[in-house]
Swiss-Prot record:
GTP hydrolase that promotes the GTP-dependent binding of aminoacyl-tRNA to the A-site of ribosomes during protein biosynthesis. The keyword Ribosomal protein does not apply. Keywords: Cytoplasm, Elongation factor, GTP-binding, Hydrolase, Magnesium, Metal-binding, Nucleotide-binding, Protein biosynthesis. The gene is tuf1. It holds the Pfam family GTP_EFTU. Transmembrane segments: none annotated. This is Elongation factor Tu 1. The lineage of its organism: Bacteria, Pseudomonadati, Pseudomonadota, Gammaproteobacteria, Lysobacterales. Mg(2+) binds at residue 26.
């Protein structure tokens, strides 16, 4: 165990706090940095420093997010905390801060509230894979039965949205007492228990490079005497010379073989996630491939035209629409590298959607796009972004 201290390269995991306003998300975030710094290294961030989160622009959307870091014995955590409910909604839908797992903070005194529910639902929709619960303000509840009742309510809520409610770790504690250095069960030890739950309950994330190969097509060139070169940034996986790939999206899927990988005009044996590469394709004409398609490992991704999405509509101040839209709205959906027109079907009982709202909708595209659940997209009108969304469920 003593050796672990010297390993600089701890596994990196992204987490964040979610939950109802004033249930103690930011206090807990501060406590995690303080106790992490004392035990495992890192830097303590005080409540005020976290609360004064700067505004950031992510894809033209204004989001306030605080980023902090702390360590456990085995991992390095990057943690996001948002000051306002609207910031959470935007953050989760745009994927500005991707989470490998979330810490749901729920006040033991109040129990689950509307935003508790909404954040769990959003986590399900946008594909946050794991949730660990911190029942905060346990110092304000004397009745053990009441604590049990709140815990049961939280478990039921999690199960309702397809999280494993019965198996989810729920830690009782007081973030405020922990910050003050209190050593009772609900003080510092509760924070250590929470970190241990993060370590054990959130599995190691799969690195992009270990996932099946995928590269969105940005450009297509024809090089005389050599054939067709497709350029783009490799989103995931590794591609080697001689690998068979599929070209997916817009038109019928077809297979080909990669006969060359180039980067910065140099020939390589392979390209991997994060690389901007040019791939030479065997027997492929320039007109066989277009921007908006993807090159991928055969069978790893399918083209779809209809999906359920969770969408945030930009407000007027963010450069979005000034007026609401109604059912049958037909904007462009920008996936990876291209715009595809689609029609929006609103949920029953929703007549119109106002700028600044978030809404669940079913989208039908005029051409198929290679997609998985969790894929992010922008909604545009004539090149101007008016919304951001994520594929929650594929319909067909």
């Amino acid at each position: 165990m003593a050796r672990a201290k010297f390993l600089r390269e701890k596994l990196h995991v992204n987490v964040g706090t979610i939950g109802h306003v004033d249930h103690g998300k930011t206090t807990l975030t501060a406590a995690l940095t303080k106790i992490g710094a004392e035990r495992f290294g890192g830097e303590f961030k005080a409540y005020d420093a976290i609360d004064a989160a700067p505004e950031e622009k992510a894809r033209g959307i204004t989001i306030s997010t605080a980023h902090v870091e702390y360590e456990s014995a085995v991992r390095h955590y990057a943690h996001v905390d948002c000051p306002g409910h609207a910031d959470y909604v935007k953050n989760m839908i745009t994927g500005a801060a991707q989470m490998d797992g979330a810490i749901l903070v729920c006040s033991a005194a109040d129990g689950p509230m509307p935003q508790t529910r909404e954040h769990i639902l959003l986590s399900r929709q946008v594909g946050v894979p794991h949730i660990v619960v911190f029942l905060n303000k346990a110092d304000m509840v004397d009745d053990a039965e009441l604590l049990e009742l709140v815990e049961m309510e939280v478990r039921e809520l999690l199960s309702k949205y397809d999280f494993p409610g019965d198996d989810t770790p729920i830690i009782h504690g007081s973030a405020r007492l922990a910050l003050e250095g209190d050593q009772s069960d609900i003080g510092v030890p509760a924070i250590l228990k929470l970190v241990e739950a993060l370590d054990t309950f959130i599995p190691d994330p799969t690195r992009d490079v270990d996932r099946p190969f995928l590269m969105p097509v940005e450009d297509v060139f024809s090089i005389s005497g050599r054939g067709t070169v497709v350029t783009g940034r490799i989103e995931r996986g590794i591609i080697r010379v001689g690998d068979e790939i599929e070209i997916v999206g817009i038109r019928d899927t077809h297979k080909t073989t990669v006969t060359g990988v180039e980067m910065f005009r140099k020939l390589l044996d392979q390209g991997q996630a994060g690389d901007n590469a040019g791939l030479l394709l065997r027997g492929t004409k320039r007109d066989d491939v277009e921007r908006g398609q993807v090159l991928c490992k055969p069978g790893s991704i399918k083209p779809h035209t209809e999906f359920e999405a969770e969408v945030y509509v930009l407000s007027k101040d963010e450069g979005g629409r000034h007026t609401p839209f109604f059912k049958g709205y037909r904007p462009q959906f920008y996936f990876r590298t291209t715009d595809i027109t689609g029609a929006c079907q609103l949920p029953e009982g929703v007549e119109m959607v106002m700028p600044g709202d978030n809404v669940k909708m079913v989208v039908t595209l005029i051409n198929p796009v290679a997609m998985d659940e969790g894929l992010r997209f922008a909604i545009r009108e004539g090149g101007r972004t008016v919304g951001a969304g994520v594929v929650a469920k594929i319909v067909k």
